[in-house]
Amino acid sequence: MIRISQLKLPAGHSKTELYHKAAKVLHIKSEQIASLQIRRQSIDARKKPDIFLIYVVDITLNGISEQNCVSRSKNKDVSIVTERPYQFPKPGTKALRRRPVIIGSGPAGLFCCYMLAQNGYRPILLERGKDVEARKKDVETFWNGGPLNPESNVSFGEGGAGTFSDGKLNTLIKDKDGRGRHVLSIFVENGAQPEILYEAKPHIGTDVLSNVVKQMREKIIQLGGEVRFESRVETFRTENGALTGVILSDGSVIDTETAVLAIGHSARDTFFKLYESGLHMEAKAFAVGLRVEHPQELINQSQYGTLHPDSLGAAPYKVTARTSGGRGVYSFCMCPGGYVVNASSEPGRIAVNGMSYSGRNGANANSAIIVSVTHADYGSDEPLAGIEFQRRLEEKAFSAGCGKIPVERYGDFSDTATTGHIPTEFVPAIKGQWTFADVKSVLPDSLSEAFIEGMEQFGHRIPGFDDANAVVSGIESRTSSPVRIVRDDTLQANIRGVYPCGEGAGYAGGITSAAMDGVRVAEAIASCYAPFSETGK
């Protein structure tokens, strides 16, 4: 197979033009190309208004020597490649006396369970929230002014917090073992868009993702796994430092010697109970901030130029800054054509997040602009002190908005005045009840100052970013877990048989990296144990 890199065509080109360009590079006719598979597609907008798409493509040929073709091309961007598909490890020999238990159905838990089910381990998946259909109803009720369900919301339920997000799938994690591409392939097998396999910044969208996780659940069941909703794990039962069972909130016990702890970063009650039970944890760096909304067209023109082609869709952005005081300020979970959503999971507290549908066709762009947090900000290096800091900020947000999402013009946030007025031509795109309020009162002064300094720097890179009519809302407090559950080289915690996993445990940041960690933990279990057999108990 021949791989061509840096294949450059103007945005809006046809499939035929892509074939012709590849053939020209190889000095052959396009009819001699048997197959062409896009491996990567990215946008080059450095020379606006001229916008280009940059490709990496894999090609097979009809009746021509690939090696001779590569040699004749005399092009450093043309090479012979051999596909190395992902390989799940051979099973171990140790007998499983009980079925493995997966705690949490976010990306980490779901993919861990999926891989184990595919390979004969018959896992039991426990999710404290509801299935995705019932969960969506609870979330819509809450957004429309109904009561918060602490067990079924944007944070808890089938698919985890990522179900109500933009569904971004890009990751910076090196993927020499092929886990990342395998994760994307599983998404596609279960209904995601095939384009996510090659787009430089792939995303699914909340509307598609909810169907994908449902299909994955159904396949797990077909493969001999079991999925139980509204099943919150309270703590572990142990003997001589090893796991013997998981104890649920209703007092029931599931006997097992293997449990994957993939509870997500919002299961604060579980963190505290497991810490009290002796599970080793440590504080981890994190960041907090606010959601910032702009007209999507402002971002489109900044990124793609005034006369940008519609085929490019809604433009994303990524910005970072370092303040004069040394703090990092950066965008997080940018949602083109998206919505700010009420992502609260605890009564008396407000947390926000961003969400986009697959079409990304909303009028506004939003992103969290977040500021790095240190131990000095919350005055303790205790493992769970970061959670308490997050809670205090969420309580301030709840108070500022009288139970609704507090919203403010950036011009008022960055000044001492509060007009409580947003121009009619720019309306916030928010899922959930919101109100004009003093958002600046939510953040500590040191973080507000860093936020403003970062916004000013971003305004130099994206004209209008720090415009007074941009809208801020808060608080974005759950960008990542403030806790890491310590695990060893076998991926187990100090309680043998417990496998901390995913973003909540401190080993991932986003859907794809969490799913990859779930696959990695499944590999660790499979490398040790033989597939589950009732007769082998």
Predicted regions located by residue number:
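Residues forming the flavin
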Residues: 1-53, 57-537
